[in-house]
Amino acid sequence: MYSYHIERHFSDRNNWLRASVLGANDGLISTASLLTGVAAAAPDFQTLLLTGVSALIGGAVSMAAGEYVSVSSQSDTEKADLHKERYELANNPDAELEELTEIYRRRGLSDPLAAEVAKALMEHDALAAHARDEIGITETSAAQPMQAALASAASFCAGAILPLLVALTASSAIVPALAVSTLCGLAGLGYVSAKLGGAPVIPAVLRVCLWGVAALVITGFIGKLAGVAV
């Protein structure tokens, strides 16, 4: 008796993992950078609260809208390709069969086997076969705009809440507190994203921390130069 084994791959998580990592990273860095600049100029509670909440809400909405529009464009392109493929299958099936056969030949199958595989897949689900092997669209890689938008908004809020809480609760030395907490958050984010994606941990952590430090230094310097409420 045979058991049916389904192997999960890291690439299956691409759609939501990319949007989530981007959203959390953006929320953490942008909010921390903005609060650092403001704190360096005018570190009063009311200004920090207004700045932080505005950054969180505005950033989350912006991320969701941008991600939805971007992924929707990708989805529209995929639908157009599938519509074209559906038309070709209905009007020129022999040419489509030969096209699929040639794809399998280029992948190393012998001519008879390539023709046999192409014919079997065309009989089973012709559109799915061409979508997968000719266009490169699969169930796991297909664009999902709403999923990406919600993941971006939620992860942005998750990333932005850390520097906001630190800025509002730190009684003194707000800028150093923001810097330390942001770097810790970025290191944690890099670690988690690397583990979920099956990538090396150290390069992922260094990558996000490097850009975080650059953003904090630049905005803190600008805020210090301004010396007034932003």
Please give the residue ranges for each predicted region.
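Structural signature of hydrophobic alpha-helical transmembrane segments
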Residues: 172-185
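Cytosol/matrix-facing amphipathic helices and coiled-coil assembly/linker segments
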Residues: 1-12, 16-18, 71-153
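The feature identifies polytopic integral membrane transport proteins across all domains of life
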Residues: 12-23, 45-52, 113, 145-150, ...
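Interfacial loop-to-transmembrane junctions
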Residues: 188-213
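Internal alpha-helical transmembrane segments
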Residues: 1-70
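Core segments of transmembrane alpha-helices
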Residues: 27-32, 152-162
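Juxtamembrane boundary at the C-terminal end of a transmembrane helix
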Residues: 220-230
